[in-house]
């Protein structure tokens, strides 16, 4: 999980979602998981 000021899609499979008011990226590749914070 990477914590970043700006989250971006890193590949075609990445999905930008909102959970509990946080913007997150979920992906089949675990290296691409990101959270805004």
Curated annotation (Swiss-Prot):
Stored InterPro entries: Ribosomal_bL36 (IPR000473), Ribosomal_bL36_sp (IPR035977)
Keyword RNA-binding: no
GO cellular component: cytoplasm; ribonucleoprotein complex; ribosome
Cystine crosslinks: none
Protein name: Large ribosomal subunit protein bL36
Record-level Gene Ontology MF annotations: structural constituent of ribosome
GO BP term, pick one: translation
């Amino acid at each position: 999980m990477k914590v970043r000021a700006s989250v971006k899609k890193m590949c075609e499979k990445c999905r930008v979602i909102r959970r509990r008011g946080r913007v997150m990226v979920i992906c089949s590749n675990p290296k691409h998981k990101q959270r805004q914070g």
